[in-house]
């Protein structure tokens, strides 16, 4: 379930004491270096709660159909709400955007009003924030105030929400409370009960990663490879080269998928120097999840991927990703799973191509052909397309079933030290088409995906526009096997892009400890207290 609606989630937000600036456009904004968009949204929600409570203005906590937090207030109290928020936001970059009338610009609440409209029914409030690199937290991450009409027998809402119609018989509305983000909220019965359309199960994420900069690893790999024949490009430095992409891939999860329960990193490398001990992160060496330890050590990603379902304590539903795959904007769990657990995968337009597996082909192309032959033999159906280079959803139970269905292929792939012409590729695409044919998967056709070859100038030149627009759900920054761009130039441009796209350090990074994760049960630095007092930053900062 999305963090915004989960009754079990009291995940705290980090406290910040960031300066307020005026931008070139004349807008006021707070510099933001620690909060993710989700955390900033919840901080603003609690700020508004405290401001309304301080003014003795009652409200209901509502969930809209997009899981945005909504505070519903009697329309007769709108003038009092405006006065209370103007006072509370006197020194805050809080903006209000009228949603139910088009063409109205957001207004700075401190200037004395919530809307330019004479009768606004839906106003979205948000503190403008600018993160390093220029990432802006705008109205997309705001909290809505909805003004409802409470009549003698009816309640009229300006828009439907996740539970109700626009017109409610008062006798059918049952008050309820919910504890969320460390507070008890008044709401309507059923509003935050898990809905049939919610994804409510735990979802973990697995990354496979290798530190290709480790000279000892490189020496061992080179020595072993001298005894093997590998396919096209499989001996390239790009197969193992890394420039801390994992750090930014993990930041993308922290920023845009707060519903992930745990993250497992499957690796035999020493953990990266920037990674701290953290309860959300578990390092998993191959010996902990390979069924046949005699197959180790391995330098074969297909082998690792064939054993992911054996990772201890991994949830039934999980995602798998590489360190060059990134979440590009906020995502819901429903991007990957249906409420019933059906996985959703993204097909590429690229066809697999004709012919069978051949030792001279790349491991990727060979595995696709082996997958095709295996499924054709088992089901009499032909797969024709590759998958996009993105994070993929998987289910442990289906993977165990596949291992029983194709034991020789799983064993052979596990035993391949390097990518082989006879490997299966479980995560791309054997699992997904097996699950599709057997009714456990469907195609995800709404996702926006971008593949970038960062070893070409054409690919690198896509990055500025990608950062500016941020209009893809997923993107892959692939390190090609036949580079056009010098390695140092590529590294500089890619890292610069990633640092600006994902500027917020994740809580598992070793960073300067000038902030702590905030407890939602304590007041925010600038928020009015609920007992009518004002928070003193010197006392509340810790």
UniProtKB/Swiss-Prot annotation:
InterPro entries (alphabetical): Stealth, Stealth_CR1, Stealth_CR2, Stealth_CR3, Stealth_CR4
Region annotation (Disordered) ranges: 522-542
Enzymatic class: transferase
Leader sequence segment: none
Domain of life: Bacteria
Compositional bias of kind Polar residues: 533-542
EC number, UniProt record: 2.7.-.-
Gene Ontology MF term list: transferase activity, transferring phosphorus-containing groups
One example of a Gene Ontology biological process annotation: polysaccharide biosynthetic process
A Pfam family hit: Stealth_CR2
Disulphide-bonded residues: none
Statement: the UniProt record of this protein carries the keyword Transferase: yes
Keywords per UniProt: Exopolysaccharide synthesis, Transferase
Miscellaneous section: Stealth proteins are part of a protein family that is conserved from bacteria to higher eukaryotes. Family members were first identified in microbes as proteins that help pathogens to elude the host innate immune system. Microbial stealth proteins are involved in the biosynthesis of exopolysaccharides. Stealth proteins are predicted to function as hexose-1-phosphoryltransferases.
Assigned protein family: Belongs to the stealth family.
Record's protein name: Exopolysaccharide phosphotransferase CpsY
Source organism (scientific name): Mycobacterium leprae (strain TN)
């Amino acid at each position: 379930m999305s963090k915004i609606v989960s009754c079990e989630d009291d995940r705290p937000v980090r406290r910040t004491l960031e300066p307020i600036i005026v931008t070139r456009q004349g807008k006021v904004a707070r510099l933001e270096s620690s909060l993710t968009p989700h955390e900033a949204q919840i901080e603003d929600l609690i700020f508004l709660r405290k401001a309304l409570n301080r003014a003795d203005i009652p409200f209901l906590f509502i969930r809209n159909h997009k899981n945005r937090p909504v505070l519903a207030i009697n329309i007769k109290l709108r003038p009092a709400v405006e006065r209370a928020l103007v006072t509370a936001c006197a020194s805050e970059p809080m903006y209000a955007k009228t949603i139910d009338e088009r063409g109205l610009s957001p207004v700075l609440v401190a200037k004395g009003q919530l809307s330019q409209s004479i009768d606004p029914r839906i106003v979205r409030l948000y503190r403008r924030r600018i993160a390093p690199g220029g990432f802006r937290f705008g109205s997309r991450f705001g909290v809505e105030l909805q003004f409802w009409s409470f009549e003698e027998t009816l309640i009229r809402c300006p828009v439907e929400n996740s539970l109700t119609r626009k017109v409610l018989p008062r006798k059918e509305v049952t008050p309820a409370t919910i504890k969320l983000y460390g507070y008890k909220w008044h709401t309507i019965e059923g509003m935050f009960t898990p809905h049939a359309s919610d994804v409510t199960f735990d979802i973990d994420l697995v990354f496979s990663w290798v530190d290709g900069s480790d000279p000892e690893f490189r020496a061992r790999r080179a020595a072993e490879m001298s005894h093997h024949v590998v396919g096209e490009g499989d001996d390239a430095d790009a197969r193992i080269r890394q420039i801390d992409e994992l750090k930014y891939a993990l930041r993308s999860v922290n920023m845009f998928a707060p519903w992930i329960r745990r993250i497992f990193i499957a690796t035999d490398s020493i953990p990266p120097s920037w990674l701290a001990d953290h309860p959300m992160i578990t390092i998993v060496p191959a010996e902990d999840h390979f069924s046949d330890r005699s197959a180790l050590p391995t330098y074969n990603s297909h082998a690792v991927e064939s054993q992911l379902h054996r990772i201890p304590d991994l949830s039934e539903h999980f995602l798998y990703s590489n360190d060059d795959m990134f979440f590009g904007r906020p995502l819901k769990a429903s991007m990957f799973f249906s409420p019933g657990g059906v996985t959703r995968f993204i097909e590429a337009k690229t066809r697999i191509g004709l012919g069978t597996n051949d030792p001279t082909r790349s491991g990727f192309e060979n595995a696709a052909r082996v997958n095709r032959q295996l499924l054709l033999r088992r089901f009499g159906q032909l797969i024709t397309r590759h998958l996009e280079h993105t994070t993929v959803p998987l289910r442990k139970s289906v993977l165990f079933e596949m291992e029983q269905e194709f034991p020789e292929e799983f064993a052979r792939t596990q035993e391949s030290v390097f990518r082989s012409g006879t490997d299966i590729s479980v995560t791309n695409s054997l699992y997904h088409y097996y699950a599709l044919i057997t009714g456990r998967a469907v195609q995800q056709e709404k996702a926006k995906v971008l593949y970038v070859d960062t070893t070409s100038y054409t690919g690198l030149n896509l990055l500025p526009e990608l950062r500016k627009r941020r209009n893809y759900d997923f993107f892959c920054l692939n390190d090609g096997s036949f580079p056009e761009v010098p390695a140092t130039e590529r590294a500089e441009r890619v890292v610069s892009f990633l640092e600006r796209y994902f500027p917020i350090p994740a809580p598992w990074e070793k960073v300067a400890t000038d902030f702590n994760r905030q407890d939602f049960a304590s007041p925010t630095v600038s928020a009015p207290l609920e007992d009518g007092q004002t928070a003193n930053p010197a006392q509340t900062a810790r």
